[in-house]
Amino acid sequence: MLVVLVGMMGAGKTTVGREYAKRHQMRFVDCDHEIEARTGVKVPTIFEIEGEAGFRRRESQLLDELTHETGLVLATGGGVVLDPANRAVLAARGIVVYLNVPTQVLWERTRNDRNRPLLQVSNPRERIESLYRERDPLYREVADIIVDGGRGNPGGMVRQVEKAIQNFHKKTCEH
């Protein structure tokens, strides 16, 4: 089984994904962390040197590579859905879970994080809202499952994801 988590920065993809993988004896990969490990530099440095387009190319290559694996939980970068080719890969491979979190919670979780290049603007809160408006329909387009959350603890969100995946399996087995 391949589980792919999508959602905005700060939605909890890494936290939820790591815990889900641990509970189900699966391998966990965070795309941003994997890109950093392979390049030897942080994401903001890649943005600085190669621009967002360069980073997105690396992200697309990694997504295509990793989504051929099974026994994997993959936390994607928030912007992975911007590329139609990535959306096609997501739609064709694995179970895609959209962690949908209110923008207020996203803001609270990310406002002090300097490792988020897209938020290094004069009004980061407005930027989060703008990115959400742009990306939410794309996350919904690729998602097999939508889990609304953000206010509870990460364990609660992991349980929601587990239950949603169980229900998804039941539905797909019935057809």
Curated annotation (Swiss-Prot):
Major localisation: cytoplasm
Keyword annotations from UniProtKB, A to Z: Amino-acid biosynthesis, Aromatic amino acid biosynthesis, ATP-binding, Cytoplasm, Kinase, Magnesium, Metal-binding, Nucleotide-binding, Transferase
Catalytic reaction annotation: shikimate + ATP = 3-phosphoshikimate + ADP + H(+)
This protein's GO CC annotations: cytosol
Residues annotated to bind ATP: G10, A11, G12, K13, T14, T15, R116
Subunit structure: Monomer.
Role noted for this protein: Catalyzes the specific phosphorylation of the 3-hydroxyl group of shikimic acid using ATP as a cosubstrate.
Protein name: Shikimate kinase
Organism: Aromatoleum aromaticum (strain DSM 19018 / LMG 30748 / EbN1) (Azoarcus sp. (strain EbN1))
Gene assigned in the entry: aroK
